[in-house]
């Protein structure tokens, strides 16, 4: 429903208490209609916020059976709209599944925001075995050779800037996929005081350069 008001980070809302809520709101302010994902525990906090905080709209979850499918849908969306779509892939294993699709998007020069997750990076609070094998110190290195940019923010507030900057870079010609990796800990961090994170307009993509004159 286009008449429904879409909240943004600049709205005065008091009930956001987890880092994943702030991160989900950063996706909403980009006006992503969908986020394509294969569910995984590494971004359980963000998944919860997409459903229970945002109400599963703007973005709406598109559940995929494989990470390469999720990236392929985002590639097709970008081919039609010339705009980035959001994708979420689980930890190191999901990123490895997605990697061939990310490479295709890179070769096709299409914009895409890929959200990953890992951790907890703090080994003292990891669950036995499963969170050890799904944690990587430099997860972005797996696709760094065929993405425009990647980041691993250390706080929810930094994650907002990473998403804003990543979308700007993805949509700026020559377009390409970007990757933002979210530690489990910052997703589940309780937010006591909400900071003013500034205007998203400061991260607008520049106009395409003029073609060379003959």
Region locations from a protein language model:
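N-terminal alpha/beta PP-like core and its mobile active-site loop of ThDP/TPP-dependent enzymes
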Residues: 1-214
């Amino acid at each position: 429903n286009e008449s429904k008001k879409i909240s943004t980070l600049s709205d005065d809302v008091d009930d956001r208490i987890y880092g994943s809520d702030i991160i989900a709101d950063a996706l909403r302010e980009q006006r992503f209609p969908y986020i394509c994902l294969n569910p995984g525990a590494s971004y359980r906090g963000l998944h919860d916020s997409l459903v229970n905080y945002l109400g599963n709209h703007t973005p709406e979850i598109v559940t995929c059976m494989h990470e390469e499918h999720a990236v392929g849908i985002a590639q097709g969306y970008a081919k039609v709209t010339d705009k980035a779509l959001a994708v979420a892939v689980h930890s190191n294993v999901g990123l490895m599944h997605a990697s061939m699709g990310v490479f295709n998007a890179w070769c096709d020069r299409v914009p895409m925001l890929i959200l990953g997750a890992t951790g907890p990076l703090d080994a003292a609070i990891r669950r036995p075995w499963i969170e050890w094998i799904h944690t990587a110190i430099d997860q972005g290195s797996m696709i760094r050779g065929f993405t425009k940019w990647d980041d691993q923010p250390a706080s929810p507030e930094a994650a907002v800037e990473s998403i804003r900057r990543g979308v700007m870079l993805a949509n700026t010609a020559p377009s390409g996929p970007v990757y933002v990796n979210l530690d489990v800990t910052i997703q589940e961090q309780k937010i006591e005081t909400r900071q003013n994170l500034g205007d998203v307009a400061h991260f607008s993509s520049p106009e395409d350069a003029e073609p060379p004159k003959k």
